[in-house]
Structure formats: C-alpha cells, structure tokens
C-alpha cells in the first residue's frame, strides 16, 4: 500500500491532522478521559486514549505536584503485538497516571489502529501524532516511554523530531543542499510540537535484525514468513506489512547520540529473554553521558508484561522530574535497580 511505500524518515513533515488539534499552551490540560482517532503524516488512523492524572494521588509526592503544575503528559509506546487495550498497557497507564496525565495508543497494525506494522520504522509517525495530540490538549511538557519495539521507536523519535531553537536555519548544510542522512535530517525538521522533553526506553533493542536468542528468532519468523504473519494476524491481532525495509531506518544505537540534550533513561532487565545486556550497554555507550542514565534491573524480564509496579513508579517519577527541566547534566552512570 502507498501508506507504507517509503520509510518514516522521509515523510516527517508538516500537515498532520489530529482530532482536536490546537496550539500548545492555549488552554489547561483536559480533566476528562478521551478516546480519539489520530491521523499520521502518512495518513494512517491511530486509536488513542487520554487518561488524566489520578486526582486521588495528587498529593502523594512532590514530583506529582510538579508534574501537575507544568502540565506534563506521558505518552506510552507499547511493544510488538501490544495495544492500548492490552492489560499490561492499561496497568502501565494506571501507574503512570498517579504522576501525570497519560496518553496510550495502538501502533499501526495493532488493535483498532489502521495500517500494517512496519516493526519500528513508520511507527515513529504514530508516536509523533500522539505527542502532537498531547500538546494540542494543553500540555507544556511531554515525556515518551516505550517498551521493546516501542523503546526503539521512542529513541528514534527523540533523535529525528527535535525542538529547534528560535531562529534556527533549516538548511541541511552550508550550501543548503542535502547533507549526510538527508532523510533523517528532513525528519528532524518536522513540526516542533511533536518533540519530546524526556525519553524512557525499556527493554529496547540497540540493533536491527538481532536473532541471538530463541525469542527473537521466533519474532523474526512471525515477521518475515507468510505463515508467521498469518499467525500474528489472527492469533496476536497484529497485521504486519510483507515488504522489507527499503531503506533500512536509523537504528536505535545510531539514534542514541542524536538525542541530547533531551534527557534519556534506558531501562533493562537482567533476565530479558529477547535482548541481552549488551543492548542497553551499547545504547549507553552511544548516547551522550551527560544526559543519559541506565538502570539494570535485577530479576526483571522483558517490557511491559514483566514490569513490576515499583519499577513503573520509579520510571514515572524520573519522567516527572526530567521533562520540562531546562537542559542540564543529569549524570551518565549505571544504576543497578
């Protein structure tokens, strides 16, 4: 289909239409739960849900109070085969809503969203539409939190969709022509209301095409083989595009050094059956240490299905403390959870 004919990096440009779009900061964030259908830059309909912060926990901690004061929203990017209606994603939303307003959505090809999954490429456009929606609702600060495939998407989104300072020239180079990575450059020139103020990548891969674990070999079978795509469609409610990437999109580890000065938190479990620990360490090594933190969580498995409430609470607290803060050094060490 034409909606998946080229990579996301070449399509990130103005003109996105979202339900209820408006200029950031024109009104206070909504206090009413909302369900809507967003429209991405390439015309895919995305099922999205808005959950206001849980008022009963408004006084639980200082971070929640600060989040409410500056209008923070956390946008949740689920893993492959997930959707906003999955119990694990709902649980993440409920925990995060103790700290901030929350937007969940279903990636293309998942749940009630349209299109077909490109397994991390065009999904960046889905996330951008959700972030724009958050800002159109009045949120002055937005954090993104992604799990597994969603983790790769939040990394790429943060690198490719940047808030540009006032007066920044849009030329690709001194001569105004196309420089290295021109498709990524065009995406970074995308509308600034789609940028994020803090990034959390949980159980994210560093590299594409990883097949080093049995779990990932099963995932590749589901993606690349007709029988696997059939099982994914009817067994996992995930519709996968049959075409290979062309061109291959920017990988998470290539995106990592482009994220600063946006704060970045990488979270990974020492019992992850999909991506071993060299993946988070590769992301840490590639990212700017002044703006990056790594949490290695003992006993944690993979993504939202395995994330305990205590970890989700800490992630939400980190996001409320970092999003909206003026760029500064946050430390670059490794923290064992």
Model segments located where?
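The serine-hydrolase catalytic nucleophile loop
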Residues: 80-93
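Alpha/beta-hydrolase active-site loop
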Residues: 118-137
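Gly/Ala-rich beta-loop-alpha elbow adjacent to hydrolase catalytic centers
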Residues: 146-154
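Conserved alpha/beta-hydrolase
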Residues: 93-114
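The alpha/beta-hydrolase serine catalytic core
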Residues: 22-25, 35-37, 118, 164-167, ...
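Glycine-rich "HGGG/HGxG" loop immediately N-terminal to the catalytic nucleophile
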Residues: 86, 108-121
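Short beta-strand element of the alpha/beta-hydrolase
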Residues: 70-79
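N-terminal cap/lid segment of alpha/beta-hydrolase-fold proteins
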Residues: 2-66
């Amino acid at each position: 289909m034409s909606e998946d004919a080229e990579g996301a990096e070449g399509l990130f440009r103005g003109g996105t239409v979202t339900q209820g779009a408006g200029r950031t900061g024109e009104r206070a964030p909504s206090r009413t739960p909302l369900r809507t259908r967003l429209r991405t830059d390439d015309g895919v309909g995305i099922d999205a849900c808005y959950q206001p912060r849980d008022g009963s926990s408004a006084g639980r901690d200082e971070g929640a109070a600060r989040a409410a004061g500056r209008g923070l929203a956390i946008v949740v990017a689920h893993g492959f085969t997930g959707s906003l209606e999955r119990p694990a994603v709902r649980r993440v939303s409920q925990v995060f809503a103790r700290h901030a307003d929350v937007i969940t959505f279903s990636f293309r090809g998942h749940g009630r969203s349209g299109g077909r999954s490109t397994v991390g490429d065009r999904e960046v456009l889905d996330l951008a539409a959700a972030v724009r929606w958050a800002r159109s609702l009045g949120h002055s600060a937005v954090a993104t939190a992604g799990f597994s495939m969603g983790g790769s998407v939040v990394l790429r989104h943060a690198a490719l969709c940047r808030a540009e300072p006032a007066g920044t020239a849009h030329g690709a180079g001194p001569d105004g022509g196309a420089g290295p990575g021109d498709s990524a450059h065009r995406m970074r020139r995308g509308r600034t209301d789609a940028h994020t103020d803090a990034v959390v990548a949980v159980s994210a891969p560093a590299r594409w095409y990883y097949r080093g674990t049995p779990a990932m070999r099963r995932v590749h079978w589901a993606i690349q083989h007709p029988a696997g795509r059939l099982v994914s469609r009817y067994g996992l409610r995930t519709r996968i595009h049959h075409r290979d990437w062309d061109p291959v999109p920017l990988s998470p580890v290539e995106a990592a050094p482009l994220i600063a000065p946006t704060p970045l938190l990488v979270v990974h479990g020492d019992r992850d059956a999909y991506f071993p620990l060299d993946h988070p360490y590769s992301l840490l090594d590639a990212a700017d240490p002044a703006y990056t933190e790594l949490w290695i969580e003992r006993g944690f498995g993979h993504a939202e299905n395995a994330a305990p409430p205590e970890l989700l609470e800490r992630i939400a607290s980190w996001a409320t403390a970092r999003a909206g803060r003026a760029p500064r050094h946050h430390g670059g060490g490794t923290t064992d959870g």
